[in-house]
Amino acid sequence: MIEFDNLTYLHGKPQGTGLLKANPEDFVVVEDLGFEPDGEGEHILVRILKNGCNTRFVADALAKFLKIHAREVSFAGQKDKHAVTEQWLCARVPGKEMPDLSAFQLEGCQVLEYARHKRKLRLGALKGNAFTLVLREVSNRDDVEQRLIDICVKGVPNYFGAQRFGIGGSNLQGALRWAQTNTPVRDRNKRSFWLSAARSALFNQIVAERLKKADVNQVVDGDALQLAGRGSWFVATTEELAELQRRVNDKELMITAALPGSGEWGTQREALAFEKAAVAAETELQALLVREKVEAARRAMLLYPQQLSWNWWDDVTVEIRFWLPAGSFATSVVRELINTTGDYAHIAE
């Protein structure tokens, strides 16, 4: 299995180095739910600005403040502890009056707003995230500048970031041990992390192999294509290749890669044969996903950062802003720009 740092680059390996997250303020994330609170209901949506706190810790503290069980506080996604992040938490408080959340005190946290809402905020129920990153000690400004220009046009590989696999790859290692021993895993969190790591690693492998062998944006017979921003897909046929290629070039359609699991993968003929060959050696992980009834799905192979802009503070420091849809990784953008020092794995999704 290819490690994250060794996955194939779309724009070639960066020529320069730099520092990501020299300070928490160098990594700012603003969550975009894509909807506004209802203004009524048994839940309260709370928008929190935090620095130096992980999401679960803040959620538990909020539950304690509201005198409710920790499971009654939910969130759409984990945000990094070592960053400045803005996100929504959701507390279920049926039959209770609206509390004064301005009295909620936690070091490194600030309540920005809160309102009633009708529904629980579930994991993954967000539109995306806006990022403001500062790269410091950049050793090759010209290379980074050109890469930013190229990314505006060609995007980046839509890899799952190293944080998906845990510190030191612990989640993927757990999945491999589970696959090899067939011992039941009772812990729901471990099950979720390990299965997610297994499927994500196989997806990354398929995309990396496609980048090695051919133009990742070249439609082949049997490819599974999806409308940009949509989840459903259809299969390309030989007769349609020219027209489908035009639509891919226009970014109207996206070529997808498999998220392996049980059931059909979604591709056919040439594309299916390629995907199967790309992960043929990973029989244990594939068998684990089938055994645990994780359904196969699809994910776009390329990611196009939206609203991408940048500003050089000086020759070695650049501020970069962009927006990514839910499930995408800022670190997959950064790895196409510079060779960073430090470990990506501690950066939450």
Curated annotation (Swiss-Prot):
PANTHER family recorded: TRNA PSEUDOURIDINE SYNTHASE D
The record's section on NCBIfam families has: PRK00984.1-4, tRNA_TruD_broad
Give the species this sequence originates from: Escherichia coli (strain SE11)
Q: Which InterPro entries match?
A: PsdUridine_synth_cat_dom_sf, PsdUridine_synth_TruD, PsdUridine_synth_TruD_CS, PsdUridine_synth_TruD_insert, TruD_catalytic, TruD_insert_sf, TruD_pseudoU_synthase
What are its GO cellular component terms? cytosol
Report disulfide bridges, numbered on this chain: none
Q: Please give the function described in this protein's UniProt entry.
A: Responsible for synthesis of pseudouridine from uracil-13 in transfer RNAs.
GO terms in the biological process aspect are: tRNA pseudouridine synthesis
- The reply on keyword Isomerase is yes
Keywords for this entry? Answer: Isomerase, tRNA processing
Provide the catalytic activity annotation.
Answer: uridine(13) in tRNA = pseudouridine(13) in tRNA
Top-rank lineage group of the source organism: Bacteria
- Enumerate the SUPFAM superfamilies for this protein: Pseudouridine synthase
Gene Ontology MF term list: RNA binding; tRNA pseudouridine(13) synthase activity
Active site, UniProt feature: 80
Instruction: Please identify the protein, giving its name as recorded.
Output: tRNA pseudouridine synthase D
Domain TRUD, chain residue ranges per copy:
155-303
The record's comment on protein family reads: Belongs to the pseudouridine synthase TruD family.
Q: What is its EC number?
A: 5.4.99.27
Q: Which residues bind substrate?
A: 27, 129, 329
